Regions:
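Short N-terminal helix-initiation segments at or just after the protein's N-terminus
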Residues: 63-74, 152-165, 178-183, 208
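Gly/Pro-enriched, hydrophobic low-complexity segments
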Residues: 1, 5, 9-12, 95-163, ...
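A broad, low-specificity signal for short, low-complexity segments enriched in glycine/proline
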Residues: 55-58, 83-88, 178, 194-198, ...
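Active-site environment of non-heme Fe oxygenases that use a 2-His-1-carboxylate facial triad
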Residues: 166-204
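Short, charged N-terminal helix-start/capping segments
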Residues: 22-56, 136-177
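Context-gated lysine
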Residues: 1, 31, 90, 95, ...
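Solvent-exposed N-terminal domain segments of exported/luminal and surface proteins
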Residues: 1-121, 128
């Protein structure tokens, strides 16, 4: 499919979608930064994906609050034998079940991730176990606080970047060799517990692993008249998998604020 996409894939005129592509990253030979970001958004992850993930917000003294979620994806875009006309502008369907802490357990989020989110915005619903109520979540996008992140991440930071790219101007800065997290088998060992990983200011570096790796570098600058907590972002994208490996997020004064 990569060869077929290379010959036929095109950005829509506004850059908020693609056409003549299916199943995997559309632009194996990208010409600009926006094509690289679409390669990340549409990278191949199979037809279905299920996993359990933990997130934590460490305090200065080393204590932390942990949230555990179960994620279940169905990738309409990557289904064998499908085409763009069949998927009804959907990339994937996602159900997230919160397992812990007990105060949040039972919370369920359902997302229909759309391809062109300007034409048809992301659809999201959230079931609150405490009130036993199901509500639409129309603002689950852009700079809105990512649920259960203690306001440390925006929604569009999930998976390093997601959603419509229309708030930024994207520039491809070329390729660079940098040290990035890669093949950190110790960190992902099933016997490793959160207490083994989490430290007051960063993860336990005895478990981390880094490689000198060639990446695409993409810079995103906030468009005039748009409001977002990040005025500039730099993305380092794996040239093999198109997974964003690291990012830098800058505040309104163009000072480095966060890294992911």
């Amino acid at each position: 499919k990569s060869r077929e996409n290379a010959r036929s894939a095109e950005l829509l005129a506004n850059g908020n979608g693609v056409r003549n592509t299916i199943m995997t990253s559309p632009f194996p030979i990208p010409k600009n930064g926006l094509e690289v970001i679409w390669n990340h958004i549409l990278r191949y992850r199979g037809e279905e994906l299920s996993f359990r993930s933990s997130s934590a917000t460490p305090q200065v003294n080393g204590s932390y609050n942990q949230v555990v979620n179960q994620y279940d994806y169905f990738f309409a875009y990557s289904r064998r034998g499908t085409n763009l006309a069949d998927i009804d502008n959907k990339i994937f369907y996602l159900k997230t079940d919160t397992i812990a802490p007990s105060s949040l357990a039972g919370t369920i989020t359902l997302v229909h991730e759309t391809l062109d989110q300007i034409r048809s915005p992301r659809l999201a619903w959230r079931y609150d176990a405490g009130s036993r109520r199901l509500r639409r979540s129309p603002n689950l996008a852009y700079e809105t606080d990512l649920p259960n992140s203690s306001s440390l991440r925006s929604v569009d930071q999930k998976d390093m970047y997601n959603g419509a790219p229309n708030q930024y101007d994207w520039e491809l800065k070329g390729k660079r060799e940098i040290f990035v997290p890669y093949n950190a088998y110790k960190l992902h060992d099933a016997d490793v517990q959160p207490d083994d990983v989490i430290r007051p200011q960063h993860i336990n570096q005895e478990l981390a692993r880094y490689e000198l790796h060639r990446v695409w570098v993409v810079e995103a600058k906030l468009r005039t008249g748009i409001s977002h907590i990040y005025s500039r972002r730099v993305f380092y994208v794996d040239e093999d998998s198109w997974q964003i490996l690291a990012t830098e997020e800058y505040d309104g004064n163009d000072q480095l604020w966060r890294v992911s």
